[in-house]
Amino acid sequence: MSNKIIHLLLNDFAAVGYGIATLGEHDMLTLQRGTAQPQGTRLVVGAGTGLGVCMLNWQGEGYAVHPSEAGHTDFAPLDATQDALLASLRKPFGRVSYERIVSGPGLLRIFSFLQNEGGGMPSRQLLEAMQKQDEAAAISEFAVNKLDPLAVRALDMFIDGLGL
């Protein structure tokens, strides 16, 4: 019997990709309906402290997982508001990647940008929630429940950044 300890280093989104490959149809939520491709290529995107991305493609007996650093690609604005957001973020960061916008910290940047651009003031309740819990989580919660117009606008812009 060997006393060797085996260590495996794994990209976080590679781990997510391997997990996704084991899910069944009932485990997933469809965002946009299309024609099912049982062994089609899959893309996994997740926003957290950064923007994780991995691709899965069918390799005969299962999916091969390909993690990436796609969150570090340059942000490409789609409208005038996103142009202005990009310009405002170039001041502190220089180069602006998608991860600077589509992540927990990115949601805060969008929220601040909208507020500074005359998008209104957050509600007292949202400000209180932001002091008690993770700020991005509070903004998301208030937006999803339509409790704060500025939070709704920020989350809408965040989702636009994901391309959904």
Pin down the residues of each PLM region:
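Phosphate-binding/catalytic loop of phosphoryl-transfer enzymes
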Residues: 1-101, 108
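Adenine-nucleotide phosphate-binding core of ATP-dependent small-molecule kinases
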Residues: 93-102, 108-109, 113-164
